[in-house]
């Protein structure tokens, strides 16, 4: 019964298309309370965590996507996933720094979260993230702010992606580097 109640509560935090599924391990946090800020497309399965910050952010997920268990997508500006995107377990995607860089500002930010909740006016160096159709992000990879993954891009497991990736390209490593381009028969 608890899982059912939790899924009902999460549905009130987002727009969930017909036949999209929030699994028992899914978590949805819409800090601003703006339901359309998290939009999940048809036939998408979410097992991970979706979070928009109190001062803004939006997450748009296309159709037939999969977000694995332990994956985290945190937005303070904009994270968009195309159609048929596969996000493996324990992937992290962020369009922001999560905390200010200056130590004093970081301390003030943390104190405010503890005392009054997440602030609604904060500069976290936000830069949008775009993930193209048919992209695949391997287990435990991290996609940082400002990155675009082209159509069909593949990110190897455990990669740290700090720069945009061209369509139909495989990258891997820390930091991620081009491994090879996919051939026409692999597209």
Regions inferred by a protein language model and the residue ranges of each:
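Conserved sequence/active-site signature of Rossmann-fold short-chain dehydrogenase/reductase
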Residues: 160
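Catalytic PLP-binding core of fold-type I/II PLP enzymes
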Residues: 164
């Amino acid at each position: 019964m608890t899982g059912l109640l939790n899924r009902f509560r999460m549905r009130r935090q987002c727009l969930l298309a017909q036949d999209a599924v929030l699994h028992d391990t899914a978590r949805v946090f819409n800090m601003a309370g703006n339901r359309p800020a998290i939009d999940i497309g048809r036939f998408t399965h979410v097992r991970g965590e979706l979070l928009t910050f109190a001062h803004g952010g939006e997450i748009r997920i296309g159709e037939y996507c999969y977000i694995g268990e332990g994956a985290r997508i945190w937005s303070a500006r904009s994270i968009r996933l195309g159609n048929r995107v596969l996000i493996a377990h324990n992937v992290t995607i962020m369009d922001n720094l999560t905390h200010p860089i200056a130590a004093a500002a970081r301390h003030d930010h943390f104190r405010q979260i503890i005392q009054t909740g997440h602030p609604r006016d904060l500069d976290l160096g936000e830069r949008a993230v775009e993930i193209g159709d048919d992209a695949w992000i391997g287990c435990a990879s991290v996609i940082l702010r400002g990155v675009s993954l082209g159509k069909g891009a593949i990110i190897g497991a455990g990669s740290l992606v700090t720069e945009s990736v061209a369509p139909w390209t495989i990258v891997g490593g820390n930091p991620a580097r081009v491994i090879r381009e996919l051939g026409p028969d692999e597209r």
